[in-house]
């Protein structure tokens, strides 16, 4: 038997509990059929996987699939099974919805369960995902924001016939599987890049026949070892008062805008346009390399970025450092990749001050020693790493297009504007 899904546009709607849905659909309220179980703070948690320990379901693990904390099972923890529905209850991203993995529920999350099984679980997950932005916008609390219980319980979910729920969930799940495949391809490329970086920054890209021991390990005979301050300086940005910011104007590049190898503008603060003339020394240009000076290492990754044309104009904020090149002996792209290397991360981590908000002092940072090949080899090394980055970017854009398509069809299917049914042959 061959099963083909048929899509068609719905023409007949009704109003129900404030929602416009197809005539053969119902509408249910979250509080009427969902119960939630709050996570607990674990008694014993370690950094490595041991027998009798489960992964701790942090948001980082649920997003990227890499477990970093493990909890000892004492039968007091809340166990999560694969594909359980989880809601981040507390924190800056409160309201985010996750599909669970086998592990221990974190203290900032709740596990959602149906009191009476009226809905396909995967359909419920996607329906809640559609409400995620709204839920995030309605959090409350002056300190640590949390989900507003009344608002959450009052959310209305359209309810198609069970078979259609499963079909909708299957379609959206297929999108997610495709996105997951691309994520794995990106992961493979990132691992290849990491391995290449380790080799390039110790062996080089040219065929070197002789090597020497140095303060930073074995390197090719014709390489130098220099302190960062011999080739670059670091400029820290300026603090601006809250009253100086405005709704529109020139972007202010803060620590939150410095990602792991790129610049992000998901949250943007603006300063008046005339600040470009008022503070010309703080104006950032395409090609500038910036580093977070507070919490420069998060999750084992360095918060560093290089500005592109699209990022201009922007003004440098406090505790973000811009590298100022003062020597022609070093290539800008080479330094960018070197600053993301395991070697540099290790050296930087030794010099951080503090635990809650670790930071680096610029004079200390500039004393870090780095390998310095001849300029021609630096450029060749950077070119090889750039070629992998280009492949990663192609995959990232491919993923972005699929996510856009999924978002569009998700909205159409979950509101009943487009219907789906199986044709059996």
Swiss-Prot record:
Domain of life from the UniProt record: Archaea
Cited InterPro entries: Restrct_endonuc_typeI_TRD, Restrct_endonuc_typeI_TRD_sf, Type-I_RS_S_subunit
GO molecular function, one term: DNA binding
Signal peptide interval: none
One GO-annotated biological process of the protein: DNA restriction-modification system
Keywords in alphabetical order: DNA-binding, Restriction system
Pfam family name, one: Methylase_S
Role according to the record: The specificity (S) subunit of a type I restriction enzyme; this subunit dictates DNA sequence specificity. In the presence of the R subunit the complex can also act as an endonuclease, binding to the same target sequence but cutting the DNA some distance from this site. Whether the DNA is cut or modified depends on the methylation state of the target sequence. When the target site is unmodified, the DNA is cut.
Note: Type I restriction and modification enzymes are complex, multifunctional systems which require ATP, S-adenosyl methionine and Mg(2+) as cofactors and, in addition to their endonucleolytic and methylase activities, are potent DNA-dependent ATPases.
Family to which the UniProt record says this protein belongs: Belongs to the type-I restriction system S methylase family.
Domain notes: Contains two DNA recognition domains, each specifying recognition of one of the two defined components of the target sequence.
SUBUNIT field: The type I restriction/modification system is composed of three polypeptides R, M and S.
Annotated protein name in UniProt: Type I restriction enzyme MjaVIII specificity subunit
Organism: Methanocaldococcus jannaschii (strain ATCC 43067 / DSM 2661 / JAL-1 / JCM 10045 / NBRC 100440)
